[in-house]
C-alpha cells in the first residue's frame, strides 16, 4: 500500500512540477521585453512617440481622405479612479504604469468634418494586470457629439454611451471581461506575443462601433498573427468577425519598438441602396519623438509640418 501511495505521489509531482515551471517561465518571458533597457530607454525618456498616417476612410459608401495621428506615451495611472495621477509619488500603491494610446482621426465628408479620438490605457506589466483598464472614445461632426467610455471593474467592463441619436441614446450596461480590439494596438507595442490568436471572444473597437452604428457587445472573431508576405521585417495581425464579416489587419515591425506601419479595415459602409463593402486604409507618413505638451507656442507649429499635418 505504501509503495502504491509513493508511486501516485511521484507521478503527481512529475506532472505538476513541469506545469509550474512552464508557468514561471511564461511569466518571466512576458516581463522580459518591458524590463529590458531598450524598453526603458525608449518609453521612459519623458517624451511621446507621435506618428502621422495618411487616411482613406470609408463613410457613407464612399472613400474620404484624411489623416490619423497615433500618440503613444507611458503614464502613471490610478487603479481605483482610473485617471492619470497628478502626484504619483503620493499614490501609496494605487499607481500602475500604463502605455497610453491617443488615436486622433480627422476626415471630411463633403462640407463637414469628422473629428474622432480614442484613448486606451493598458498596463505595461500585462502578466500582473492582463486587461486594459479604460477606453474612451468620442466623435464630433456637424450633426452632433457622441461619447463612449469603458471602465474595467471586478465583473468586467462597465460601458457608458452617450449619443444624439434617439435609437442609441444615453446608456449604461456591462460587458464580460474579454480582450478589447482597442487594446490590440498597445499590446503590439508592449509585447506582440500577447496578441490572442485562433477563435476568440472580443469586444470590437469603440470607433468602429460608432461608424457602423452597432452597439458594443462581445463577438466572435478569427484572429491570426503571421509574417507579412511582402516584407520579412514586418508582421500582420488580422481579425475576421463572424457576424458582421468586418476585417481588421494591422501591419507592424517585427522587432522592438514594434512600430505600427499601416492598417486596413473592411466593412459594409453606407445605408440602404448606397451601402457597399469598402476598405479604410491608413499608411505611415511621419514620426516625431517629442514632449508635445510643452510645444504649445505659435512657433511650435513647425512641428505639425514635420508630421505632415498642414490641414
For the regions a language model picked out, list residue spans one by one:
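Acidic, serine/threonine-rich low-complexity disordered tracts
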Residues: 26-154, 193-311
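Bacterial N-terminal signal peptides
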Residues: 9-18
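N-terminal Sec signal peptide cleavage junction
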Residues: 20-23
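Bacterial N-terminal signal peptides that target proteins for export
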Residues: 1-8
Amino acid at each position: 500500500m505504501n509503495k502504491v501511495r509513493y508511486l501516485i505521489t511521484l507521478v503527481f509531482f512529475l506532472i505538476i512540477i513541469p506545469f509550474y515551471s512552464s508557468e514561471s517561465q511564461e511569466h518571466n518571458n512576458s516581463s522580459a521585453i518591458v524590463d529590458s533597457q531598450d524598453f526603458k530607454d525608449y518609453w521612459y525618456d519623458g517624451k511621446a512617440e507621435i506618428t502621422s498616417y495618411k487616411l482613406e476612410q470609408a463613410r457613407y459608401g464612399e472613400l474620404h481622405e484624411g489623416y490619423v495621428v497615433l500618440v503613444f506615451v507611458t503614464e502613471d495611472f490610478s487603479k481605483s479612479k482610473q485617471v492619470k495621477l497628478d502626484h504619483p509619488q503620493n499614490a501609496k500603491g494605487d499607481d500602475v504604469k500604463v502605455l497610453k494610446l491617443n488615436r486622433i482621426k480627422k476626415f471630411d465628408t463633403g462640407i463637414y468634418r469628422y473629428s474622432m479620438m480614442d484613448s486606451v490605457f493598458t498596463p505595461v506589466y500585462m502578466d500582473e494586470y492582463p486587461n486594459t483598464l479604460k477606453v474612451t472614445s468620442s466623435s464630433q461632426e456637424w450633426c452632433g457629439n457622441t461619447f463612449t467610455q469603458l471602465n474595467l471593474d471586478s465583473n468586467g467592463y462597465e460601458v457608458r454611451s452617450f449619443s444624439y441619436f434617439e435609437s442609441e441614446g444615453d446608456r449604461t450596461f456591462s460587458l464580460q471581461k474579454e480582450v478589447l480590439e482597442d487594446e490590440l494596438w498597445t499590446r503590439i507595442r508592449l509585447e506582440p506575443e500577447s496578441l490572442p490568436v485562433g477563435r476568440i471572444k472580443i469586444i470590437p473597437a469603440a470607433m468602429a462601433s460608432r461608424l457602423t452604428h452597432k452597439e458594443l457587445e462581445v463577438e466572435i472573431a478569427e484572429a491570426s498573427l503571421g509574417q507579412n508576405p511582402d516584407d520579412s521585417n514586418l508582421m500582420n495581425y488580422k481579425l475576421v468577425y463572424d457576424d458582421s464579416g468586418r476585417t481588421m489587419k494591422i501591419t507592424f515591425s517585427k522587432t522592438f519598438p514594434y512600430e505600427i506601419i499601416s492598417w486596413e479595415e473592411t466593412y459594409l459602409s453606407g445605408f440602404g441602396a448606397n451601402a457597399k463593402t469598402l476598405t479604410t486604409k491608413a499608411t505611415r507618413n511621419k514620426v516625431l519623438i517629442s514632449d508635445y505638451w510643452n510645444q504649445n507656442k505659435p512657433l511650435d507649429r513647425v512641428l505639425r509640418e514635420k508630421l505632415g499635418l498642414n490641414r
